[in-house]
A protein has these predicted regions:
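Flexible cytoplasmic inter-helical loops of multi-pass small-molecule transporters
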Residues: 76-93
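Hydrophobic/aromatic residues within the transmembrane alpha-helices of Major Facilitator Superfamily
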Residues: 2, 36, 72, 103-106, ...
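Selective transmembrane alpha-helices of multi-pass membrane proteins
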Residues: 50-79, 139-146, 156-184
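Residue-level signature of transmembrane alpha-helical cores of multipass secondary-active transporters
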Residues: 30, 98-102, 135-139
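Hydrophobic alpha-helical transmembrane segments in multi-pass integral membrane proteins
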Residues: 40-42, 103-113, 172-184
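Alpha-helical membrane-protein architecture signal
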Residues: 88, 92-100, 126-130
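Juxtamembrane transmembrane-helix termini in multi-pass membrane transport proteins
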Residues: 1-57, 112-135, 147
Length: 184
């Protein structure tokens, strides 16, 4: 939950572009969405991948495509051209968008499948709920720290050029985070 990945990089970019308060729905969507995903995967959705192995490959393709789209949106969310102010265009991700994003987040899937296979291998409901509760309790403070880091960077992003450079850097890091997904 604290390590760099698509959620945290997007939250840092959102914190830098929109501030902590406007990013709050995005943070809550990540925390609650991932917890919900853990529960649903833990109680049986993982069986889909076992029954239909091609569904995992489809998920990978959709995930990569969506993350590339989000990276493009971040990279091109520049400030108002020619205004001299570093006020970003666009809006932060909504609660629902962040909840839904968890289902195409490759790092989220990796974390969920690993945690559930190690700590709830028998798909026992109590074990699944315990794993989800632990992640739920840890997740929000972790994602908040990335948003706060982004907000702290606002004082450095005072010109159009700096904001554009920051957004392009965050988008590039988001694309680089796909490297493990693309490995055979």
């Amino acid at each position: 939950s604290i390590t760099p990945g698509p959620n945290n990089l997007m939250l840092m970019a959102s914190g830098a572009n929109f501030g902590f308060r406007r990013t709050l729905p995005h943070m809550l969507g990540v925390a609650l969405g991932f917890t919900l995903m853990l529960v649903l995967v833990g109680i049986g959705l993982v069986g889909l991948f076992e029954t239909y192995p091609a569904s995992y490959e489809v998920l990978k393709v959709v995930s990569v495509a969506y993350l590339l789209y989000l990276a493009w949106k971040i990279a091109t969310s520049a400030s108002h051209p020619g205004s001299g102010e570093s006020k970003p265009e666009g809006t932060p991700m909504t609660f629902l968008q962040a909840v839904l994003f968890q289902w195409v987040n490759p790092k989220g899937w990796t974390m969920a499948l690993t945690a559930l296979s190690v700590y709830a291998p028998s798909q026992n409901l109590l074990a699944v709920l315990f794993v989800a509760a632990v992640f739920g309790a840890i997740n929000f403070p972790c994602v908040s720290s990335w948003t706060l880091l982004g907000q702290r960077l606002q004082s450095l992003l005072t010109s159009d050029r700096r904001l554009v450079a920051f957004n392009v850097t965050m988008a590039t890091l988001l694309v680089v985070s796909l490297y493990p997904v693309l490995l055979p």
